[in-house]
């Protein structure tokens, strides 16, 4: 008997990061010393007090039962308190927060929950590749808006055709930005809220890197903008702020109608989040030790960015001056595409980077560097690349 994938699965886009990992693994299997700067996987451990909270709760038999479908109230109250303290946003813990096993789940399921086949979704180019999974699964259409260096990789809302804006159901934004490291300003968010109200477009803010700012920069939340909850929601993941990428914990916050739709689809797909994981999440959000740890984490990324960018500048390779995330967005040398340049680096000097084309056509003139190894290895990576004499060195 033969079983065939459904048409829905066949229509899914290629998993960009899976292909990247396969290339790196193949080179490592050959015995190469690969410096892997191609992924966005935090290399630092989860903070001790969070792990301890998980272990303590996991030993409690009450944690072994089914959790509340829509998240335990103490966790949602902790999320609301976190947003109030850090962003000045008031949230109703029951009506304006949705708990989920990672922000990717919510970002992918939103088109299924709030859009109909054929509805239009606006996406950034370059942008997080997995946004397209939601497009395919929801059978919606999409158009992109370019993020350019000339506009500091922020959307030019005035350049979106009026006819497109009026047809659009939702727009996704992501700041600090993956892959560019650009950040959004309060003025931009104010303009975005006004634009969304004018054209009746829902806003979906992906705040995955919200706590990560270089040289003390504090990223604003979209929800802190007056009127933001009238038009949208924001996803907050524990992966980057608390080094919990493998734990799979996140929440969405904001507009109560959008939150209700996400809760409803999750009622049918999942049976809550492991209670001990939620207790660990509470420790992450509320324990003062987290603030100290995040400050140290930002200092670590500061030193790494400085080491890489300064070494790259010495060989004539100039970085976009990112202010958030843990990435460097680097131009490819003349005569190369992002893929051909990335393939050259992996093959010739065993340095893995992420081709910008994987984030959209507008990214093809760049590669993304993950600052997720020690400064010495970052400098070594630049020194290896320097031996190819592709820049003015």
PLM regions and their residue ranges:
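N-terminal small-domain helix-loop-helix segment of the aminotransferase-like
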Residues: 2-101, 109, 284-287, 391-393
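Conserved glycine-rich beta-strand-loop-beta hairpin in the small C-terminal domain of fold type I
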Residues: 282, 298-309, 319-331, 363
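Conserved core segment of the aminotransferase class I/II
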Residues: 227-299, 306, 310, 389-390
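Helix C-cap/helix->beta junction micro-motif
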Residues: 27-30, 138, 198-199, 315, ...
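A short helix->loop->beta-strand "cap" motif at the edges of active sites that frequently abuts
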Residues: 119, 140, 198-201, 229-230
């Amino acid at each position: 008997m033969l079983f065939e994938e459904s048409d829905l699965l066949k229509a899914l886009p290629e998993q960009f990061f899976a292909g990247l990992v396969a290339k790196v693994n193949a080179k490592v299997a050959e015995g190469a010393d690969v410096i892997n700067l191609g992924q966005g996987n935090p290399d630092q451990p989860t903070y001790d007090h969070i792990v301890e909270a998980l272990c303590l709760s996991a030993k409690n038999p009450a944690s072994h039962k089914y959790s509340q479908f829509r998240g335990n109230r103490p966790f949602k109250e902790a999320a609301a308190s976190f947003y109030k303290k850090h962003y000045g946003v008031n949230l109703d813990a029951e009506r304006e927060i949705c708990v989920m096993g990672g922000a990717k789940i919510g970002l992918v399921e939103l088109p299924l929950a709030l859009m109909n086949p054929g509805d239009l979704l606006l996406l950034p180019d370059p942008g997080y590749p997995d946004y397209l999974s939601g497009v395919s699964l929801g059978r919606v259409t999409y158009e992109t808006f370019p993020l350019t260096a000339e506009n500091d990789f922020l959307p030019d809302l005035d350049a979106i055709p009026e006819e497109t804006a009026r047809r659009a159901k939702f727009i996704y934004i992501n700041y600090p930005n993956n892959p560019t490291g650009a950040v959004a300003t309060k003025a931009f968010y104010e303009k975005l809220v006004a634009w969304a109200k004018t054209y009746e477009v829902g806003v979906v803010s992906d705040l995955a890197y919200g706590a990560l700012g270089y040289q003390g920069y504090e990223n604003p939340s979209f929800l802190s903008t007056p009127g933001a909850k009238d038009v949208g929601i924001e996803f907050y993941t524990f992966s980057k702020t608390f080094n919990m990428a493998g734990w799979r914990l996140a929440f969405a916050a904001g507009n109560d109608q959008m939150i209700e739709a996400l809760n409803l689809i999750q009622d049918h797909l999942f049976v809550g989040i492991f209670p001990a994981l939620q207790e660990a999440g509470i420790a992450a959000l509320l324990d003062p030790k987290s603030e100290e740890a995040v400050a140290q984490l930002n200092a670590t990324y500061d030193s790494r960015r400085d080491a890489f960018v300064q070494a790259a500048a010495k060989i004539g390779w100039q970085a976009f001056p990112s202010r958030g995330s843990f990435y460097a967005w680097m131009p490819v040398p003349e005569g190369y595409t992002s893929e051909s340049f990335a393939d050259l680096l992996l093959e010739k000097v065993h340095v893995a980077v992420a081709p910008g084309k994987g984030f959209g056509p507008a990214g093809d003139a760049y590669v993304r560097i993950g600052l997720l190894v020690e400064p010495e290895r970052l400098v070594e990576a630049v020194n290896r690349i320097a031996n190819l004499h592709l820049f003015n060195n």
